[in-house]
């Protein structure tokens, strides 16, 4: 009984450290609009998801990482859906491309999209 209690406490602490919620079961149904309190987690490992950016007039700023440069809205931003079931976190780009990882051992999936990112320069106006 003590072991079960200890593992339960350890699981709750891991969720708080990783920024994951302590909702019933910790599950998140597939969504393109994850809870605000989870953006820090999701946008760290797949920064090209549209829900990570706030865009106006073709210029976008990252909602989570304020030190990121402004970017030009282009094909770098993808319409992602994210989901979580037990310890499996999934990013789906809707075109058959998806990335699955252990939520407690996340792996960034930013590289495929980095080539498309265009940093905003004042001369671009």
UniProtKB/Swiss-Prot annotation:
It is found in: Virion; Host endoplasmic reticulum-Golgi intermediate compartment. InterPro entries: ASFV_fam_110. Keywords: Early protein, Glycoprotein, Signal, Virion. Residues 1-29 form the signal peptide. Glycans are attached at residue 65. Belongs to the asfivirus MGF 110 family. Causes the redistribution of lumenal ER protein to an enlarged ERGIC compartment. This is Protein MGF 110-4L.
